[in-house]
Structures are given as structure tokens and as C-alpha cells.
Amino acid sequence: MAAAVPRRPTQQGTVTFEDVAVNFSQEEWCLLSEAQRCLYRDVMLENLALISSLGCWCGSKDEEAPCKQRISVQRESQSRTPRAGVSPKKAHPCEMCGLILEDVFHFADHQETHHKQKLNRSGACGKNLDDTAYLHQHQKQHIGEKFYRKSVREASFVKKRKLRVSQEPFVFREFGKDVLPSSGLCQEEAAVEKTDSETMHGPPFQEGKTNYSCGKRTKAFSTKHSVIPHQKLFTRDGCYVCSDCGKSFSRYVSFSNHQRDHTAKGPYDCGECGKSYSRKSSLIQHQRVHTGQTAYPCEECGKSFSQKGSLISHQLVHTGEGPYECRECGKSFGQKGNLIQHQQGHTGERAYHCGECGKSFRQKFCFINHQRVHTGERPYKCGECGKSFGQKGNLVHHQRGHTGERPYECKECGKSFRYRSHLTEHQRLHTGERPYNCRECGKLFNRKYHLLVHERVHTGERPYACEVCGKLFGNKHSVTIHQRIHTGERPYECSECGKSFLSSSALHVHKRVHSGQKPYKCSECGKSFSECSSLIKHRRIHTGERPYECTKCGKTFQRSSTLLHHQSSHRRKAL
């Protein structure tokens, strides 16, 4: 193999990167081992750092360097280049370990080993790691956050690459060397990391051209109009947040790939809605929206998810291991994006405003879901009955009606529910909690909806009418059940005795006759009842409450049925 030699400039003059660069032909490069190639990259990087730190022009020789950056120096690379009659072998003792090496290149490679050990030592525990990437991975265990900085080692060195010159050099944390991060050589492959203990210098400049740098030091732009949209990708915590779905990323490349799913026309099209994806796996995940398939169930609460990552984040709710904690209230979250959304609740920030009704939202996807109320769009369709929904969660809840799935079970009585909110409301029957108070009469309710229906008793409002007989009702559900009297429909049948009922609640109450179950117990005397309404009526014996008053004579009663019987006596007297 022919000896690869650098170009030799004059003994005294301006030094360029090409003067100290060592070039190999394609055939020569193929003969080098991996270790030799790594050494070559290390030497070239060191030469680049030296030239840059001295302020020398790093472009091609036929380009004119800026006068401010021209400097006359002795050739530093002569110690690395064998000259006629001078042997390259010389004793080079290592100051770190005392090892003596004869070859200057081996000596440089050996010193780099100590340098790596120093750079790859964990500041928290002192542990040495083999590679910078391993160090970054290890540091996550201490700080509990994701971060990503691409290694300068991955940079590709290109012949005669035109490089810009910085007024003052930046310091790359990976190697601790002065390098031009804005140069074409390093700008695309490395990101500058700024820590509290490091002092960063001014932004790079090119003669006759203004340069704009992103505040996060991860990307440089040639115009101010280019940097402003880029900065909007960041949150105040340095996290990339998708404006379409709210998902957050610590790496720009992951964020960019994710956004491609929202915007780019990929080769994988959804047959249901026509949406395109760049990856087949993304299409498969998306199709679960239409099918309602949830492949990853939570063993703690039974809730299912279409993506494994969503399940892992959800499980942190049960374990309480959320690494992202709100400084205002101390609440922890499994994802940084969820913390950011939560913090907007403290600040009151609502960036998304509906032009139709003026309602505001903190999250864009909530705003999009709300807009479907005005547009009538229902993209989520049930495969069983064809019913469509505006939100995915409503489709999942609806499908449980077909499958009979009731994942939320009461530990007190064993009753199961389709929705967690229904379980929470049901548990108040056992605890006696009634958080909703009527301002008119002081009556308490365990559900907000029951309070709203009750308030119509005071206002006299009955907004729901039967289309057959015109009877008015205070809630829509009562109209639906009433209309079955006209149609004769009794869809709920008892499997024990075959008796049919108008409503599912009536069937559930009836089943307690066969099971003997009496879940509602009086705290005063210990008597148990199969129906909640029976317990309420019984309690009036202890409290003395008589809420039903006769308008004719003013007499009061504990039960409405007793009042009706009493009123009939007035009618008989009138006859």
C-alpha cells in the first residue's frame, strides 16, 4: 500500500485543513482495519480542532479566507509527518500510566483511551463506561430524564468540504475539544450541549452573512424566519411536543418520524378513512382505532390500550413511579408531555379557541374533538352495528355493550360496570358519600346527573315528552323506558324465572330476589334491603322526615304512595 502523505505547504504561511489532511484512495481505505479507520478519524478530528481553535481558514485553498481569520503559524503537523532522515520512532512516555510508546500515532491512540475513560465516567457514581452512548444511557438512571446527543465520532469526513469559520470555538462535551459546531463537517451530525457550568460563546458567523442559532443549540439557520418556526417545536422544558396529538419526544429525529405519520403521504393507506402512513406498524396501530382492538390490557384495572408504550405509561399510575413531578402540587406523571399539559392547568393557559362557540382548550386534540360537535364528524365507527362516534373513547365504551365487557368491579358487592365513573358513583352507595347538594331543599345526591334531574322538580321543567301520549318527563332515559309501555317491549329477561322487565336496572333489582342479596344496610338498626330506594324510605323512620305534603289539608307523609292514597280520600268526599 502506497504511503498516504499530506500535502505540504510552505514552511511559513497560512495553514488550511487540506494542508494537514491525509487522503486515502478507495483501494487503500478498504485495506485498513476498523481500528486504523477509527484512528484516522480521531487524528483528522484533532487536526480540525487545532486549525479551528487557531482561527485558521478551513475552506479549500482556492477560496479566499476572511482577513480577520487569517493567521501565520508554524506547521503543527510536522511532528506527525516523517521527514527525510528523521525517524518517526521516539520514546513517548504516557503521563497518566507511565507506559512508553515509540510510535507517535500509537501514543496518540493510547492517550485517547485515557481521555475516553475520563469523558465516559459517570459524575454521579464514578462508574467508567466503554462508550459515550452507554454513558448517556447510564446517566438516565440518575436524572430520570431522556436526552440525546449524537456522538461526534459518527461524523462523516468529506474531502474538500467547505467549512465556515466561527469567531470563537464551542466546546463539545463528548471530547472536550474546541471544534466548530457550525461547520458543514459537524453541524449535521453533532449537537452542542449547554450545561449550567459551561460558558457558551457567541454564535458562529460567516463573512457577509447573518446566522441564526436555535436557543436549544441543536440546529443553526441561515435566516431568522427559519429559526422561529423551529423554536415553536420546543416546550419550556426542552421537549418536542406534537401539536396534533400532544405526544412528547426528547429526540428531534423521533419527533420528526412521528410527525410524518400526521402529515406525510406514505405507501400504507387505511382502507377505512384513507389516511396514509410511512410505516406499516403505524398503519396497524391506526387500524385498531376502527376495529376497537386493544391488544395490551392492564392487569391492575383491566383497561386496555392499542399501543404497548401507552400501557407502560398507564401502569405508572398504579405504581406511583412517575418520574415527572409538578412543582406546584407534587403530582407525578409517567410522560413529560402529560406533566406539561397538567402545568397549563395551574397557569390557566388555553391556547386553542373555538371560533364557533368561543370555548377554549389547553390541548389541541381536545380542541379537535370539540370541533366535531359543530361539524358533525364521527370518524369512529362500530363494526357490529355501524354506529359512529366523534371520540375513540366513546366507541370503546359502546363496544362493551356488544361484548358484555364490564371491567370495573365493586369490591364490596361484586357488581361490575362498563365505565370507571359509574363504579365511582356506585361506591358512594356503600360509603354513604353524597357530594352533590340541592340549594333549594338541601337534599344530597351521589351523582351530579341525579342532582340536575332533581332540580327540575323545583323548577317544574320537563323537557322530554312522549310522542305517543304527550306525557312529560324530566330526563330522556325516563322517556325511553316509558315508551316501552306503548310498544310492549320488555328487552330484559330473567334467566331464572323468565320474567321480563322494561329496564336493566329493574332486572338487576329483581335478580336479588333469587340470590337473596341485600347490599343496602341501615346504619341505625342494621336492617338490609335489596333496593337503594327501600333503604331511603326506611331511613325516614329514624329521621322523622315526611317530604310529601297534601295541598288540600297540609298533612305530610313519608312516602309518595301514601300521599296518593290520602288524596283519593279528598276526591271521594268531593263526590
Swiss-Prot record:
Bias (Polar residues) ranges: 71-81
Keyword Nucleus applies: yes
Position of the signal peptide: none
InterPro entries: KRAB, KRAB_dom_sf, Znf_C2H2_sf, Znf_C2H2_type
Location of the protein in the cell: Nucleus
GO MF terms held by the record: DNA-binding transcription factor activity, RNA polymerase II-specific; RNA polymerase II cis-regulatory region sequence-specific DNA binding; zinc ion binding
Nuclease keyword on record: no
Name recorded for this polypeptide: Zinc finger protein 587
Organism, scientific name: Homo sapiens (Human)
Gene responsible for this protein: ZNF587
